[in-house]
A protein has these predicted regions:
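Formylglycine-dependent sulfatase
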Residues: 1-436
Length: 436
C-alpha cells in the first residue's frame, strides 16, 4: 500500500432477515416472546423505528439484494427473474469478501449465479418447516401448497423436490449450513458477508413441541391484553413517543369467541411465538460462532423483517397446528396484535405492512447503550451502506448492460451517531398501494 501503510481490516457483515414478522414481535420491540439474543444485539447496538420494506416478501428481498426499487429490477409483479441490478454478493465479492447466502430467496434466479460464492437454500417463498419434499417413511404426508414442487439450490445444484433427513427443521438446518460455510472459509483470511434469510415466522405455523410448550398459559388472556401490554412496553422503551397513538384495534373481542375458537387461537399464537423464539435461539448460535472466531467487534450485524405480520388465511391438512401435517397461518386477529401499534398487515402500504424492527450491531462503530433512532430509512439504503463500509464500488455496468443508479443512501453516518442526508424522498409501491 502507498507509504507502506498497513492494510485496514475490513469489517465482516451478517444480515439476518425474518419473514412475515410484525413490528412488535421481538422483546426489544415490545413482545412477550423470548428473544434474548436479539435483545442483546439491540442493547449494545442501534434500533430504528422507521425502517421500511415494501410490504411483500419477494420485492423486499429484491430491494435488499440490489439497492433498487422493485420496478427498477423487474421484481414488482411476481417472483421471477431479475431484469436489472447487481446483488450485493457480487459487489462485495469484487471488494475481496467471501460472500455467502443461506435460506429463502424467492426468485427463479439462483443467487450462486449472481455473485455469491456459496448459496444453500430455498428459491421459493414458503415451504413445510419439517419436510419441504416428499413423504418420508413412517411419517405423515407433509402439508404443502404444491406437494413436491419446492425448489432448493446448493450452489449450482438444483434439487426438486428436496426431501431432507428426518431431523430437518428449516430454522435449525439453515443455521447449520451457515455455520458450516463460516467455518469452511476461516482459512481464507477474507472478510465474510453472510446473508441468512430465515422463513420464520411465515406460515405454515410449525415448531418443535418443546418450544411451543414454553408459551403454555401465555396467550389465554386474548388479543387486547397482549396488544396493550406490547404498546405499553414500546412506550416505556422509548420506541414510541408518549403522544403516538395506538391504531384502532381490528381484532375480534376475545369474549365473543367460543371456547373452541379461543383454544384454536391460543395454539396459533403459541406456535408463532415458538417459531420466533427458535429463530432467536439460532441467531444466538451465529453470534456465538462469530464471537468464537474473535470477529464480533468487527462484524456489522443487521436484523430486519421483509414485511409485517400476515393476515392471510391458509388451511391445509388435518394434523394439530404446529405439526408436519398441518399448514395453518396466523390470520387476521393475531396479525393485528403482531403489528402493534400500527394498522393493517403484509401486502398493505400502511405501517403495519411496511415498518420493520431494525437492529444494527457493530461494537467497533455503533454507540452502545441500546440507542434508538427515529430517522426514516428503507431497504434501498442497505446496498449503499455495505458499499460504504466495505470500500467497494458500485459498477456502471453489469453483464453488458448499464445499471440504474442506486436509489438509497448509506446509513453509515447514522451508525456513527450522525444524521443522513437524502436527496430524494422515499417513495415506493406494491400492488395497489403506495407510500411516500
Amino acid at each position: 500500500m502507498p507509504g507502506g501503510a498497513a492494510a485496514i481490516k475490513k469489517p465482516n457483515v451478517l444480515i439476518i432477515l425474518a419473514d412475515d414478522m410484525g413490528f412488535s414481535d421481538i422483546g426489544c420491540y415490545g413482545a412477550e416472546i423470548d428473544t434474548p439474543n436479539l435483545d442483546r444485539l439491540a442493547g449494545n447496538g442501534l434500533r430504528l423505528t422507521q425502517m421500511h420494506n415494501t410490504s411483500k416478501c419477494f420485492p423486499s428481498r429484491a430491494v435488499l439484494l440490489t439497492g433498487l426499487y422493485p420496478q427498477q429490477c423487474g421484481m414488482d409483479h411476481g417472483p421471477g427473474k431479475f431484469t436489472s441490478g447487481i446483488f450485493f454478493g457480487e459487489v462485495l465479492r469484487r471488494a475481496g469478501y467471501r460472500t455467502l447466502f443461506v435460506g429463502k430467496h424467492h426468485s427463479t434466479d439462483n443467487p450462486y449465479d449472481w455473485g455469491f460464492d456459496h448459496y444453500r437454500g430455498m428459491r421459493d417463498g414458503a415451504a413445510n418447516y419439517f419436510n419441504p419434499g416428499l413423504q418420508r417413511s413412517g411419517e405423515p404426508r407433509p402439508a404443502q401448497k404444491r406437494y413436491g414442487k419446492r425448489v432448493f439450490a446448493f450452489d449450482d445444484t438444483i434439487v426438486q423436490p428436496y426431501t431432507p433427513p428426518s431431523d430437518y427443521y428449516s430454522t435449525d438446518t439453515w443455521t447449520d449450513w451457515a455455520l458450516e460455510l463460516l467455518e469452511d472459509g476461516r482459512a481464507s483470511g477474507q472478510p465474510f458477508c453472510l446473508y441468512v434469510s430465515y422463513q420464520a415466522p411465515h406460515d405454515p405455523l410449525q415448531a418443535h413441541e418443546h418450544d411451543i410448550a414454553k408459551y403454555a398459559g401465555r396467550y389465554e388472556v386474548g388479543y387486547e391484553a397482549i396488544a396493550a401490554a406490547r404498546y405499553r412496553r414500546q412506550q416505556e422503551m422509548g420506541l414510541l413517543d408518549q403522544r403516538y397513538p395506538r391504531s384502532q384495534p381490528t381484532h375480534r373481542p376475545w369474549d365473543a369467541l367460543s371456547t373452541e375458537e379461543q383454544a384454536d387461537q391460543v395454539r396459533r399464537m403459541q406456535v408463532y411465538a415458538a417459531m420466533i423464539d427458535s429463530m432467536d435461539q439460532n441467531i444466538g448460535r451465529l453470534i456465538a460462532k462469530i464471537e468464537a472466531m474473535g470477529e464480533l467487534d468487527n462484524t456489522l450485524i443487521l436484523f430486519a423483517a421483509d414485511n409485517g405480520a400476515s393476515a392471510e388465511v391458509v388451511r391445509i391438512g388435518d394434523g394439530p397446528i404446529g405439526a408436519i401435517d398441518r399448514w395453518a397461518s396466523l390470520e387476521r386477529d393475531w396479525a393485528n396484535v403482531a403489528n402493534t401499534p400500527f394498522r393493517l398487515f403484509k401486502n398493505n402500504s400502511y405501517e403495519g405492512g411496511i415498518c420493520t424492527p431494525f437492529i444494527a450491531h457493530w461494537p467497533a462503530v455503533i454507540r452502545g447503550g441500546g440507542a434508538i433512532d427515529h430517522t426514516a430509512a428503507h431497504f434501498i439504503d442497505i446496498m449503499p451502506t455495505l458499499i460504504d463500509i466495505a470500500g467497494a464500488e458500485y459498477p456502471a455496468t453489469y453483464r453488458g448492460e448499464a445499471l440504474p443508479p442506486l436509489s438509497g443512501v448509506s446509513l453509515l453516518p447514522l451508525l456513527r451517531d450522525n444524521s443522513i442526508q437524502r436527496g430524494n424522498p422515499l417513495y415506493f409501491q406494491w400492488n395497489a398501494g403506495g407510500a411516500v
